[in-house]
Structures are given as C-alpha cells and as structure tokens.
C-alpha cells in the first residue's frame, strides 16, 4: 500500500523546471552512514518532485541506493554504463532501464544529453571528474544546465575552497565561480537549482560547437 501511494504521489507531482536530473555519485557507500542517508534523501526529494533519475547505471554503493529509492518511488530511472564496468558496478539485477555504452566519454555525453541538470553526491575520482567536466562544459557554453553539489557533512568543503582559491588567484573568473550551486541538504539544493540563472559569459556560443564530435548535441528524441 505504501509503495502504491508513493508511486501515485510521484505521478501526481507537478512538473517543475526539471524532468530528469543526472546524479553523479560513488560506486562505494563510504565509511559513514551519513553518505547513504544523503543518497536516500536525495532520491526521496526527486520522487516528491516527480523528477526522473539519470545515473551511472550501477547497483552498488550510493548509485544503487539512490536508483532503488527513485524506482521504488514510481519515477523513471535510466542508468548509463560502459560494458567494461558492468561486472564491478552491477551486482545482481540492474535498477531501472540500463543503456550500455562503449566508453567513459560516451557515458558522460549520454548522461548529459538525457538530463536537465546535474548533481554530485559524495564520491571519488570518477564523481569529481564528472562534476568538473559539467562545470567546464557550462563555462565553455556547451550547456546552460544547473550543476549542483550536495555537500554532505562538509565532504566537499576542500573542493569548494580550491575553487575559491582559483578565483582569488585569477585562474577562475568570478562569474564562473558561480556556476556550481552547493547546499548541505537535498531540499535546499533543489530549491537553489530551481532558481539558478546563468551569470557567466560562455567562452563560445553553443551553436559554434561541433556537437556531434563532442557527443553532446542531440536531444533525447534524436538519440
């Protein structure tokens, strides 16, 4: 009965700015329960807003937690995973729809194509690299989608401090420092992302990029 109620609530939820959000996160759960709790809360927040999930396709770690939460809540889940990672990142049954791609570049490009915004939960090198690429693509003008950082228990404080250092030392323009939106809770982060408007001047207009070469220009309908 509870599952049916959650699914009905998700279907009935009014559509906001985002139909699908891409979440980058670890294939590990981390050493403290607070990280898993944050993944569950973000999943519940997406469900409450009727937002579908695009993610890295794994069924383990934080990836598995958020994917199962969104799926159980009645919202769509699309996982994008390179064939080479399937043995290590999928344990047992996959969660939701899974699209298999050839490599990491294609994975990021497909996740970006399918999403209206991006959020990074705590994670390792891969999560940080995905986050930084989406920030860079925004700076370059390849996309204008919000990029959010769920700063769970200060996990990303050092990274945010590094961004501030880069701006202070003249390597990151002040307006580009505003590309990243951060908050300690899922509810606050989604609220900020709903209100986000681009304030930086992109390096080049989106129409000037060879999107087919970058693997980014198609809409979900064209994919």
Swiss-Prot record:
GO MF assignments: cytokinin riboside 5'-monophosphate phosphoribohydrolase activity
Cysteine-cysteine disulfides: none
Residues where substrate binds: 89, 107-108, 124-130, 136
Record-level GO BP terms: cytokinin biosynthetic process
Stored Pfam families: Lysine_decarbox (PF03641)
Keyword Cell inner membrane: no
Enzyme Commission number: 3.2.2.n1
Tissues expressing the protein: Expressed in shoot apex, immature inflorescences and flowers.
Family annotation (InterPro entries): LOG, LOG_fam
Keywords: Cytokinin biosynthesis, Hydrolase
Source domain of life: Eukaryota
Catalytic activity annotation: N(6)-(dimethylallyl)adenosine 5'-phosphate + H2O = N(6)-dimethylallyladenine + D-ribose 5-phosphate; 9-ribosyl-trans-zeatin 5'-phosphate + H2O = trans-zeatin + D-ribose 5-phosphate
Region (Disordered): 201-223
GO CC field: cytosol; nucleus
Function according to Swiss-Prot or TrEMBL: Cytokinin-activating enzyme working in the direct activation pathway. Phosphoribohydrolase that converts inactive cytokinin nucleotides to the biologically active free-base forms.
Family: Belongs to the LOG family.
Protein name per the record: Probable cytokinin riboside 5'-monophosphate phosphoribohydrolase LOGL1
Originating organism: Oryza sativa subsp. japonica (Rice)
Name of encoding gene: LOGL1
């Amino acid at each position: 009965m509870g599952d049916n109620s959650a699914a009905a609530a998700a279907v009935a939820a009014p559509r906001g700015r985002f139909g699908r959000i891409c979440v980058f996160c670890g294939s590990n759960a981390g050493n403290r329960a607070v990280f898993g709790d944050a993944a569950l809360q973000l999943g519940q927040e997406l469900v409450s807003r009727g937002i579908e999930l695009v993610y890295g396709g794994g069924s383990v770690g934080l990836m598995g937690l958020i994917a199962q939460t969104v799926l159980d809540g009645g919202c769509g889940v699309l996982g994008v995973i390179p064939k080479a990672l399937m043995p290590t990142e999928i344990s047992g049954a996959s969660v939701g729809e899974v699209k298999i791609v050839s490599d990491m570049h294609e994975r990021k490009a497909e996740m970006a194509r399918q999403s209206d915004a991006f959020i990074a939960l705590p994670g390792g090198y891969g999560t940080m690299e995905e986050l930084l690429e989406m920030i860079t693509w925004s700076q370059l003008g390849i996309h204008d989608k919000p990029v959010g950082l769920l700063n769970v228990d200060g996990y990303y404080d050092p990274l945010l401090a590094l961004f501030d250092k880069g701006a202070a030392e003249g390597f990151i323009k002040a307006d580009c420092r505003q590309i990243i939106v951060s908050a300690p809770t899922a509810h606050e982060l989604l609220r900020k992302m709903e209100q986000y408007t681009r304030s930086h001047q992109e390096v080049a207009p989106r129409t000037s990029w060879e999107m087919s070469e970058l693997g980014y220009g198609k809409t979900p309908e064209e994919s």
